Protein backbone atom coordinates (compact mmCIF):
# COMPACT_ATOMS: atom_id res chain seq x y z
CA UNK A 1 0.00 0.00 0.00
CA UNK A 2 1.14 3.53 -0.78
CA UNK A 3 0.14 6.40 1.47
CA UNK A 4 0.39 10.03 0.42
CA UNK A 5 -1.03 12.64 2.79
CA UNK A 6 -4.62 11.59 3.59
CA UNK A 7 -5.03 8.93 0.89
CA UNK A 8 -3.92 5.33 0.52
CA UNK A 9 -3.42 3.60 -2.84
CA UNK A 10 -3.06 -0.05 -3.72
CA UNK A 11 -1.60 0.80 -7.12
CA UNK A 12 1.87 2.31 -7.43
CA UNK A 13 1.11 3.43 -10.99
CA UNK A 14 -0.32 6.89 -11.60
CA UNK A 15 -1.52 7.81 -15.08
CA UNK A 16 -2.14 10.90 -17.18
CA UNK A 17 -4.97 11.81 -19.53
CA UNK A 18 -3.25 13.55 -22.43
CA UNK A 19 -2.57 12.40 -26.01
CA UNK A 20 -5.21 9.64 -26.13
CA UNK A 21 -7.02 9.25 -29.44
CA UNK A 22 -10.42 9.36 -27.72
CA UNK A 23 -11.86 9.62 -24.19
CA UNK A 24 -13.17 6.05 -24.46
CA UNK A 25 -9.66 4.71 -25.09
CA UNK A 26 -8.35 6.83 -22.22
CA UNK A 27 -10.81 5.37 -19.72
CA UNK A 28 -10.24 1.79 -20.91
CA UNK A 29 -6.48 2.23 -20.57
CA UNK A 30 -6.78 3.73 -17.10
CA UNK A 31 -8.92 0.82 -15.98
CA UNK A 32 -6.47 -1.68 -17.47
CA UNK A 33 -3.59 0.02 -15.67
CA UNK A 34 -5.23 -0.35 -12.27
CA UNK A 35 -4.30 3.26 -11.53
CA UNK A 36 -6.23 4.97 -8.76
CA UNK A 37 -4.80 8.47 -9.18
CA UNK A 38 -5.08 10.24 -12.52
CA UNK A 39 -3.64 13.62 -13.49
CA UNK A 40 -5.78 16.12 -15.33
CA UNK A 41 -4.54 19.30 -17.03
CA UNK A 42 -6.79 22.19 -16.09
CA UNK A 43 -6.31 23.82 -19.49
CA UNK A 44 -7.83 20.80 -21.26
CA UNK A 45 -11.20 20.64 -19.53
CA UNK A 46 -14.25 22.86 -19.17
CA UNK A 47 -14.60 23.07 -15.41
CA UNK A 48 -18.07 24.59 -15.72
CA UNK A 49 -19.40 21.41 -17.34
CA UNK A 50 -19.49 18.19 -15.33
CA UNK A 51 -20.29 16.41 -18.61
CA UNK A 52 -17.02 17.55 -20.18
CA UNK A 53 -15.75 14.88 -22.61
CA UNK A 54 -12.66 14.21 -20.49
CA UNK A 55 -13.87 15.00 -16.99
CA UNK A 56 -17.18 13.12 -17.10
CA UNK A 57 -15.78 9.64 -17.88
CA UNK A 58 -13.09 10.08 -15.23
CA UNK A 59 -15.68 10.93 -12.62
CA UNK A 60 -17.70 7.89 -13.71
CA UNK A 61 -14.62 5.65 -13.44
CA UNK A 62 -14.29 6.47 -9.76
CA UNK A 63 -10.59 7.36 -9.81
CA UNK A 64 -9.06 10.09 -7.69
CA UNK A 65 -8.27 13.19 -9.73
CA UNK A 66 -4.99 15.05 -9.47
CA UNK A 67 -5.42 18.37 -11.30
CA UNK A 68 -2.18 19.82 -12.59
CA UNK A 69 -1.04 23.32 -13.44
CA UNK A 70 0.57 22.40 -16.76
CA UNK A 71 0.85 25.55 -18.86
CA UNK A 72 1.71 27.80 -15.94
CA UNK A 73 4.96 29.70 -16.46
CA UNK A 74 5.21 31.42 -13.09
CA UNK A 75 4.38 30.72 -9.48
CA UNK A 76 1.56 33.26 -9.64
CA UNK A 77 -0.07 31.51 -12.61
CA UNK A 78 0.24 28.13 -10.91
CA UNK A 79 -1.33 29.37 -7.68
CA UNK A 80 -4.21 30.91 -9.63
CA UNK A 81 -4.81 27.64 -11.51
CA UNK A 82 -4.65 25.67 -8.26
CA UNK A 83 -7.33 27.80 -6.65
CA UNK A 84 -9.58 27.38 -9.69
CA UNK A 85 -9.10 23.61 -9.59
CA UNK A 86 -9.94 23.40 -5.90
CA UNK A 87 -13.11 25.41 -6.36
CA UNK A 88 -14.27 23.55 -9.47
CA UNK A 89 -13.33 19.98 -8.54
CA UNK A 90 -13.58 20.12 -4.78
CA UNK A 91 -10.11 18.70 -4.23
CA UNK A 92 -7.13 20.13 -2.39
CA UNK A 93 -4.78 17.74 -4.16
CA UNK A 94 -2.54 19.29 -6.81
CA UNK A 95 0.24 18.32 -9.14
CA UNK A 96 2.34 21.46 -9.37
CA UNK A 97 3.89 22.02 -12.80
CA UNK A 98 5.68 25.18 -13.89
CA UNK A 99 7.64 25.03 -17.12
CA UNK A 100 8.24 28.36 -18.89
CA UNK A 101 9.97 26.88 -21.95
CA UNK A 102 7.42 25.25 -24.26
CA UNK A 103 10.12 23.44 -26.23
CA UNK A 104 11.85 21.53 -23.45
CA UNK A 105 9.10 21.58 -20.78
CA UNK A 106 11.66 21.45 -18.01
CA UNK A 107 10.37 22.54 -14.60
CA UNK A 108 11.44 25.91 -13.21
CA UNK A 109 13.00 25.13 -9.81
CA UNK A 110 12.76 28.65 -8.39
CA UNK A 111 9.13 29.23 -9.32
CA UNK A 112 8.18 25.69 -8.30
CA UNK A 113 9.61 26.09 -4.80
CA UNK A 114 7.97 29.50 -4.42
CA UNK A 115 4.56 28.21 -5.50
CA UNK A 116 4.85 25.07 -3.39
CA UNK A 117 5.45 27.07 -0.24
CA UNK A 118 2.42 29.30 -0.90
CA UNK A 119 0.11 26.42 -1.78
CA UNK A 120 1.07 24.34 1.25
CA UNK A 121 0.18 27.32 3.44
CA UNK A 122 -3.23 27.42 1.76
CA UNK A 123 -3.89 23.79 2.65
CA UNK A 124 -3.12 22.09 -0.65
CA UNK A 125 -1.64 18.62 -0.86
CA UNK A 126 1.18 19.51 -3.23
CA UNK A 127 2.95 17.00 -5.47
CA UNK A 128 5.54 19.02 -7.41
CA UNK A 129 6.95 17.98 -10.76
CA UNK A 130 10.62 18.90 -10.58
CA UNK A 131 14.06 18.20 -11.92
CA UNK A 132 16.03 15.28 -10.52
CA UNK A 133 17.85 17.60 -8.14
CA UNK A 134 18.40 16.11 -4.66
CA UNK A 135 18.82 19.55 -3.06
CA UNK A 136 15.62 20.91 -4.58
CA UNK A 137 13.65 17.78 -3.67
CA UNK A 138 14.79 18.14 -0.07
CA UNK A 139 13.74 21.79 -0.03
CA UNK A 140 10.32 20.91 -1.45
CA UNK A 141 9.95 18.27 1.24
CA UNK A 142 10.93 20.78 3.93
CA UNK A 143 8.30 23.33 2.87
CA UNK A 144 5.62 20.67 3.24
CA UNK A 145 5.10 18.91 -0.08
CA UNK A 146 3.34 15.57 0.36
CA UNK A 147 5.59 13.87 -2.21
CA UNK A 148 8.17 14.83 -4.82
CA UNK A 149 7.95 13.99 -8.52
CA UNK A 150 11.43 14.18 -10.08
CA UNK A 151 11.74 13.57 -13.81
CA UNK A 152 13.36 10.53 -15.35
CA UNK A 153 13.82 12.36 -18.66
CA UNK A 154 12.06 15.22 -20.49
CA UNK A 155 8.26 14.99 -20.71
CA UNK A 156 7.05 12.75 -23.51
CA UNK A 157 10.56 11.75 -24.58
CA UNK A 158 10.25 8.02 -23.71
CA UNK A 159 13.98 8.04 -22.91
CA UNK A 160 13.67 6.22 -19.61
CA UNK A 161 15.61 6.87 -16.41
CA UNK A 162 18.30 9.17 -17.78
CA UNK A 163 18.62 10.75 -14.33
CA UNK A 164 19.12 7.44 -12.53
CA UNK A 165 22.12 8.51 -10.43
CA UNK A 166 20.31 11.57 -9.07
CA UNK A 167 17.08 9.64 -8.54
CA UNK A 168 18.95 7.18 -6.34
CA UNK A 169 20.14 10.03 -4.11
CA UNK A 170 16.66 11.56 -3.96
CA UNK A 171 15.13 8.21 -2.99
CA UNK A 172 17.78 7.53 -0.34
CA UNK A 173 17.31 10.85 1.45
CA UNK A 174 13.55 11.33 1.06
CA UNK A 175 11.12 11.05 3.96
CA UNK A 176 8.11 11.57 1.67
CA UNK A 177 7.07 9.37 -1.26
CA UNK A 178 9.09 9.71 -4.46
CA UNK A 179 7.10 9.45 -7.69
CA UNK A 180 9.22 9.26 -10.84
CA UNK A 181 7.47 11.39 -13.43
CA UNK A 182 8.18 12.07 -17.11
CA UNK A 183 10.28 10.23 -19.67
CA UNK A 184 9.23 6.68 -18.82
CA UNK A 185 8.82 5.01 -22.20
CA UNK A 186 8.37 1.27 -21.69
CA UNK A 187 7.28 -0.97 -18.81
CA UNK A 188 10.84 -2.00 -17.99
CA UNK A 189 11.63 1.63 -17.12
CA UNK A 190 8.79 1.59 -14.60
CA UNK A 191 9.96 -1.70 -13.12
CA UNK A 192 13.48 -0.31 -12.76
CA UNK A 193 12.18 2.76 -10.91
CA UNK A 194 10.35 0.59 -8.38
CA UNK A 195 13.37 -1.71 -8.00
CA UNK A 196 15.49 1.37 -7.21
CA UNK A 197 13.15 2.29 -4.38
CA UNK A 198 10.74 4.77 -5.95
CA UNK A 199 7.29 4.66 -4.38
CA UNK A 200 5.40 5.10 -7.65
CA UNK A 201 5.70 6.27 -11.24
CA UNK A 202 3.48 8.47 -13.37
CA UNK A 203 3.05 7.40 -16.99
CA UNK A 204 1.11 9.12 -19.76
CA UNK A 205 2.74 9.33 -23.20
CA UNK A 206 4.08 5.77 -23.26
CA UNK A 207 0.56 4.42 -22.79
CA UNK A 208 -1.38 6.99 -24.81
CA UNK A 209 0.70 6.82 -28.01
CA UNK A 210 1.15 3.03 -28.06
CA UNK A 211 -0.45 1.13 -30.93
CA UNK A 212 -2.64 -0.55 -28.31
CA UNK A 213 -2.91 1.76 -25.29
CA UNK A 214 -5.03 -0.68 -23.29
CA UNK A 215 -2.51 -3.51 -23.71
CA UNK A 216 0.36 -1.15 -22.89
CA UNK A 217 -1.45 0.00 -19.75
CA UNK A 218 -1.83 -3.61 -18.70
CA UNK A 219 1.88 -4.19 -19.35
CA UNK A 220 2.80 -1.24 -17.14
CA UNK A 221 0.57 -2.60 -14.40
CA UNK A 222 2.42 -5.92 -14.49
CA UNK A 223 5.81 -4.19 -14.61
CA UNK A 224 5.01 -2.13 -11.53
CA UNK A 225 3.99 -5.25 -9.65
CA UNK A 226 7.18 -7.02 -10.77
CA UNK A 227 9.44 -4.12 -9.81
CA UNK A 228 7.87 -3.76 -6.39
CA UNK A 229 7.99 -7.50 -5.71
CA UNK A 230 11.63 -7.65 -6.81
CA UNK A 231 12.55 -4.87 -4.39
CA UNK A 232 10.68 -6.53 -1.54
CA UNK A 233 12.36 -9.86 -2.32
CA UNK A 234 15.79 -8.35 -1.64
CA UNK A 235 17.99 -8.50 -4.76
CA UNK A 236 21.49 -9.94 -4.40
CA UNK A 237 24.41 -7.56 -4.05
CA UNK A 238 26.22 -6.42 -7.18
CA UNK A 239 29.80 -7.58 -7.63
CA UNK A 240 32.67 -6.54 -9.87
CA UNK A 241 33.86 -10.15 -10.03
CA UNK A 242 32.31 -13.37 -11.27
CA UNK A 243 30.74 -15.53 -8.58
CA UNK A 244 30.39 -19.24 -9.33
CA UNK A 245 26.97 -20.71 -8.66
CA UNK A 246 28.40 -24.20 -8.09
CA UNK A 247 31.82 -25.71 -7.16
CA UNK A 248 34.29 -25.53 -10.04
CA UNK A 249 36.58 -28.43 -9.10
CA UNK A 250 34.85 -30.52 -6.47
CA UNK A 251 33.27 -32.93 -8.93
CA UNK A 252 36.67 -33.62 -10.55
CA UNK A 253 38.23 -34.41 -7.19
CA UNK A 254 35.36 -36.76 -6.42
CA UNK A 255 36.04 -38.67 -9.64
CA UNK A 256 39.80 -38.92 -9.04
Swiss-Prot record:
Listed pathway(s): Cofactor biosynthesis; thiamine diphosphate biosynthesis
Classification via SUPFAM superfamilies: ThiG-like
Single biological process term from Gene Ontology: thiamine diphosphate biosynthetic process
Top-level taxon of origin: Bacteria
Active site: 95 (schiff-base intermediate with dxp)
Repeat is among the record's keywords: no
CDD domains in the cross-refs: ThiG (cd04728)
Function: Catalyzes the rearrangement of 1-deoxy-D-xylulose 5-phosphate (DXP) to produce the thiazole phosphate moiety of thiamine. Sulfur is provided by the thiocarboxylate moiety of the carrier protein ThiS. In vitro, sulfur can be provided by H(2)S.
Listed name of the protein: Thiazole synthase
Amino acid sequence: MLRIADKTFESHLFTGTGKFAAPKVMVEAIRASGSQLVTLAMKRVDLRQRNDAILAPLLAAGVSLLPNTSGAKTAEEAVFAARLAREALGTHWLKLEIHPDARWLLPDPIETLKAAELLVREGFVVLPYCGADPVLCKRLEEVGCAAVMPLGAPIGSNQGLETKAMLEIIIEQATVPVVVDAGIGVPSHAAQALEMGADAVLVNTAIAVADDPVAMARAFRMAIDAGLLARQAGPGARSTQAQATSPLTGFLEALA
